[in-house]
Amino acid sequence: MKLSRRSFMKANAVAAAAAAAGLSVPGVARAVVGQQEAIKWDKAPCRFCGTGCGVLVGTQQGRVVACQGDPDAPVNRGLNCIKGYFLPKIMYGKDRLTQPLLRMKNGKYDKEGEFTPITWDQAFDVMEEKFKTALKEKGPESIGMFGSGQWTIWEGYAASKLFKAGFRSNNIDPNARHCMASAVVGFMRTFGMDEPMGCYDDIEQADAFVLWGANMAEMHPILWSRITNRRLSNQNVTVAVLSTYQHRSFELADNGIIFTPQSDLVILNYIANYIIQNNAINQDFFSKHVNLRKGATDIGYGLRPTHPLEKAAKNPGSDASEPMSFEDYKAFVAEYTLEKTAEMTGVPKDQLEQLAQLYADPNKKVISYWTMGFNQHTRGVWANNLVYNLHLLTGKISQPGCGPFSLTGQPSACGTAREVGTFAHRLPADMVVTNEKHRDICEKKWNIPGGTIPAKIGLHAVAQDRALKDGKLNVYWTMCTNNMQAGPNINEERMPGWRDPRNFIIVSDPYPTVSALAADLILPTAMWVEKEGAYGNAERRTQFWRQQVQAPGEAKSDLWQLVQFSRRFKTEEVWPEELLAKKPELRGKTLYEVLYATPEVSKFPVSELAEDQLNDESRELGFYLQKGLFEEYAWFGRGHGHDLAPFDDYHKARGLRWPVVNGKETQWRYSEGNDPYVKAGEGYKFYGKPDGKAVIFALPFEPAAEAPDEEYDLWLSTGRVLEHWHTGSMTRRVPELHRAFPEAVLFIHPLDAKARDLRRGDKVKVVSRRGEVISIVETRGRNRPPQGLVYMPFFDAAQLVNKLTLDATDPLSKETDFKKCAVKLEKV
C-alpha cells in the first residue's frame, strides 16, 4: 500500500495515539504501526513551557528514540513547537551526569577541591553531617532549599513536607518566584484565589487578543498558532501587542505598541479612565460583583534595607489598602488622560485610543495575555491588579472568549509551585504559613505535633542569596533549576554566598550547569520520562505520565533523593522536646516514617502497577509512592474550589482542569453554569473572597528602580528566544537547536550602534553598575529594540547576562525585575 507523506504522518499519529490508549486502529494505520512495532508509544506532557502540550513518546531498547505531537491532546492537537520535536535529545547530552560528585582534596571534602565521584551513601553522609550541624548550632533558619516549577507535583509536595514539617524550616522557595510570584499575589489580592479563571478554549471564541509583555510567538508558540488561526480566519478579530521592543508577535499585530519601560502602569490606568469616561462600565456586573480599594503607595523596591531606595520609601513592602468610593476611583484614574499617557509612554494617541476601544466595546470579547513583561516588574503585582480592573469594569471575565489570562513559563509552575505551595509562605491549596488555622489543617492531616510548621515566612529566592552571602543560611540544596545563571545580580549577591567557606551547597541536576559547577556537591538527577510524573499547566490542567525508561548510571529522581535522605533523620534530631511530648508515639521514628511511609501514603500497593510498568521509587519502597502522595495532597483542595480528580483518572485522560467535581472538569471559574461552586441565581461569585466580590484597586504609576542616566545611558531588557528554554541547559545539548541559535547576541537599534561606532557582528562589552559581559552586536533579526534600549537573552552560559541585572523585586511578590536596568556599551 502506498501512502503520501501527509497520509503517512497522519496515520502514524493516529496509530500511535490509539496504540497508547489500547484502542483498535484502521488498517492503514495498523500497517504503519507494523513497520515500527519495536517502538513503544505512551503519552506525556512536554518537558518545556507552561503551555502543557501533549506528546507521544516513543521508546526502544531502554531509550527515548522519538517524539510527536499527541493528536488527542486538546492543548496542541498533534502539533509541537521546534523544542517539542527534539525532546528525546535533551536526555542524551554527552555530559549527562551519572554519579554524585563531591569537591574533594586528599580524600575528603574540601570547598576548594576538585569534583570527585562518590557513592550515594557517601553523598548522603556528607549532607547528613552538614544538615545536622547547622540545625544543632543555628537552628532551622540556617538551612534552605531552592526548588522548581519543573518539579513534578509529588516532588514539590515531598520537598515541602520535608522542609516545613520535617526540618521545621520555611526556607524553601521555587524558581517560580522569578517568574510567577507577581501573578500569584495579583490573583490573591483581586480574587482571593490563585490561577486563571479561563482556559485555552477562549482562543477560538475571542474577538480581540491583547498581549501585555508577552512574546507568545516564541515563548508560547502552540498557543500563538491557535491565535494566528483565529485572527487570519476572521477579519473581525483584532490583535494588539504591547512591549518595550518589537518582536515576532508584532508580525500578527493590528496594533503594535512600543512603550517606555515601566509605563505600562500608565496605559492600564488610562484605559480604565477611558472606560469610565465613555460610559462603558458594565453597571449590572460592577454593582453586584466588585469592591473598590485604594492601595498603599511608595512601597520600595525589595532591595536590602540599607539601600537608599528602601530608606527613602514611605511604605516599604506594604500590601495595605482601604475602601474607596466609585467617585474617588473615577477621580483617581481621571489623571491618566490621553495626552498625559502619550507623553509618559511615548505611544501615539491613536494607538492608545484603539487599544482602549477594544476593552470599552461591549460587543467585543477580549482576552488579555501576559507573562514576564508584567510579572518581572518592580510593580508586577500592581500591573496584574490593573489589568484585572479593566475586565472587572467591563464584566469581560469568566465567560467563553473573555478574561484576563496569566501565562506561565514552566511546565508545573502552576501545578507544583503554586498549587502544592512550595513557596516560602504557602501551603497546599492557597493556604499560607502565617495562618494558624491553615497550619493546623496541615499538621492534623500529616499527623505531626501542633506547632511543628513555623508561622514565620521563610526566605524567598533573592533573600536566600542575601542570607547565604551574610552567612545566615549555611546549607542550601537546589533542585531542578539553574539559579546561578538565571537569578539576578550574580556578582554581588549570589556567587559570594555560594563560594563562602561557611556554606555547603548541593545541586541536583542532570547536567553540569553553571549552578552545578559552583556547588560543593552535585547529585545526578533523572529527568522527564525517566520517572513517573505530573505537571499542572497554565489553564489548570493536571497531566500525568508514566516512567518510560530508566535514568542512566546512578542518576535518581528528585523524589527518590528527598525520600531517601529523610531516612537519615529521627524526630529527636529535628524537633524540640515540647513537640515530641505532644505525640510521643513519633519518638524514635525517622522523617521517612513520619512523612512518607505513613499508613495514608503507603496504602496503595505496588501491585496496582502493571507488571512491566517501570516505577523505580515505588518498586524500591514497596508501595505506590506517587499515588499515595498525590491522594494525600489532593485532599487539601477537595471541597474548597481546588478539587483534583482521583489519581487513576489522570493516567486515562489527556489532563483535567480543576476544579474537577463529580468527574467533570471546569473550563470557566466563578460564573454560573460553568463553575460547580457558583449556585443557580448567583450569576458570578468570586468565592475566594468572603463576600464573593472581586476587588478593583487604585494604584498609580511609580518609576523603575534603575533607569538610564548620563553614564549608563541604555535600558537593558533580558528574556528568551524560541530555540532555547530558560538557561539552555537542556536545549543547548540538542545539536539542531544549538546550531539554530548558538550564542547570545545583543539586539540593538542600528542608530544606537552607529552612534557607538558598532556594527553588526562586532564584539561589545555590556557594562552595568554590577558587572560586565562580552556579547555580539545584532542590529537585525527577530527583535528590534527602539533607540535607548538593548535586549539580550539569558540562555548562554558563556554570556551571563545576570551579572548585569539588579536584584530589585516587586516588594509584594518578591519577584525580580529582569526587564529594566541601566547599562552602557564599550567596543571591544
Swiss-Prot record:
CDD domains the UniProt entry points to: MopB_CT_Nitrate-R-NapA-like, MopB_Nitrate-R-NapA-like
Catalyzed chemical reaction(s): 2 Fe(II)-[cytochrome] + nitrate + 2 H(+) = 2 Fe(III)-[cytochrome] + nitrite + H2O
Cofactor(s) for this UniProt protein: [4Fe-4S] cluster; Mo-bis(molybdopterin guanine dinucleotide)
Classification via Pfam families: Molybdop_Fe4S4 (PF04879), Molybdopterin (PF00384), Molydop_binding (PF01568)
Disulfide bonds listed in the record: none
Binding of Mo-bis(molybdopterin guanine dinucleotide), residues: 83, 150, 175, 179, 212-219, 243-247, 262-264, 372, 376, 482, 508-509, 531, 558, 718-727, 802, 819
Any one of the GO BP annotations: cellular respiration
Annotated localization: Periplasm
Residues annotated to bind [4Fe-4S] cluster: C46, C49, C53, C81
Membrane-spanning ranges: none
Record GO cellular component, one term: periplasmic space
InterPro entries xref list: Asp_de-COase-like_dom_sf, CT_Nitrate-R-NapA-like, MoPterin_dinucl-bd_dom, Mopterin_OxRdtase, Mopterin_OxRdtase_4Fe-4S_dom, MopterinOxRdtase_cofactor_BS, Periplasm_NO3_reductase_lsu, Prok_molybdopt-oxidoreductase
PANTHER family linked: PERIPLASMIC NITRATE REDUCTASE (PTHR43105:SF11), RESPIRATORY NITRATE REDUCTASE (PTHR43105)
Family classification: Belongs to the prokaryotic molybdopterin-containing oxidoreductase family. NasA/NapA/NarB subfamily.
Name the UniProt record assigns to this protein: Periplasmic nitrate reductase
Native source species: Escherichia coli (strain 55989 / EAEC)
